[in-house]
Amino acid sequence: MKQYLDLVQSILDQGAWQENRTGVRTLSLPGAALRFDLQQGFPAVTTKKLAFKSAIGEMVGFLRATRSAAQFRALGCKVWDQNANENEQWLANPYREGPDDLGPVYGVQWRHWPAYKLLPSSAGGQVADALARGYRQVAEVDENGAPHVLLYKAVDQLRQCLDTIRQSPGDRRILFHGWNWAQIEEMALPPCHLLYQFLPNAGTREISLCLYIRSNDVGLGTPFNLTEGAALLHLVGRLTGYKPRWFSYFIGDAHVYENHLPMLREQLAREPYPAPQLVLSDRIPDFAVTGKYEPQWLEQVEPGDFTLSGYQHHAPLTAPMAV
C-alpha cells in the first residue's frame, strides 16, 4: 500500500515534534489525506502483517454498540484492554462502571445516540411533532420560569444512513458521527475516527465513503482504521445494493510516536505487495441479488464473515500502544 508509506514518509520529512497526554513525543503533520479505489483492491498494509481479525472484531463491536473491553475481546479484539483497565485518568473517572467498562464510545453513539428536546409545554405542535418522530416525554421541568417538557429518544444514526441510501440516494447528508460533547467526559477515549459520510450514486450503482479522523496514530491506528472503514463500506454496499468504490480518508493530526520510528523505518525499506481483495460471506444478504432490504445484518454480522483473498505481507512488526 504505497499511499500509506507515502504518508509515513511525509510525516518524517515535514512533521514537527509535539508533546501530548501520553508522555511519548510525536512527529505530527496537520492535515493529511489518502484515497483508494476499492475496485482495485482492499487497502490492507502489506509491509507488515495486518491484524485483520482484530480490526474486523473491533468494527463488529462498534456495529453492536459495544462498551465493554470484554465484549471486544470475545470478538477477537484486545486493543481496548489498556484503555479500559490501565489508563489512570479513566480508572479515576466517576463514570467508569467497573472493570472493562469503556463508557459510551464509538458504536454506542453510532447506534444509540441519546437525543433530547426541551420544548415549551405550550408548544403543542412542536411536542406533537417530536412524539410523532419517536420521542417520548421523560420529564416536566421549569426553564427560565416557564414550564417545559423534556423528550428523549435513542437515534440509530447508522441505520438511518442505510435507510436514506435506499430511499433517497441523491441526498448529500448521509452521514453519522461519534463526537457527542455531552458525553465526552463519560468515555474512556473520545472518538478519533469520528465522521463518516456515504456517497451513493444511483446511476453507476457505486457507493463511496469519506472518513474524517481528528487524530491518527499512523504507526498502529491507520492500518486498523483503513481496514474498518473499507470493510464497513463493503458491508453497507452489500446491504443496499451498491458496489464499493472510492474510500477517502482525511486526518486532522497525523502523527507518529517516537517509539514507533524503528518499526516504520523498517516498513519504508520494504516493497509493498499488490492489494488483496475483501470477501464477504454468503451469509450476508446481497440486496443486488435478493432485492430484499435487511438492515438488521448490521448487528448480525460476525468477524468470520470477512476474509482477505490474495493477501501477501512481509514479516510482522510490533510497537507499543500509547495510552
UniProtKB/Swiss-Prot annotation:
Keywords: Cytoplasm, Methyltransferase, Nucleotide biosynthesis, Transferase. It comes from the Bacteria. SUPFAM superfamilies: Thymidylate synthase/dCMP hydroxymethylase (SSF55831). It is an enzyme of class 2 (transferase). It is found in: Cytoplasm. CDD domains: TS_Pyrimidine_HMase (cd00351). The active site is at residue 192. GO terms for biological process: dTMP biosynthetic process; dTTP biosynthetic process; methylation. Belongs to the thymidylate synthase family. Bacterial-type ThyA subfamily. PANTHER family: THYMIDYLATE SYNTHASE, THYMIDYLATE SYNTHASE 1. HAMAP family: Thymidy_synth_bact. This is Thymidylate synthase.
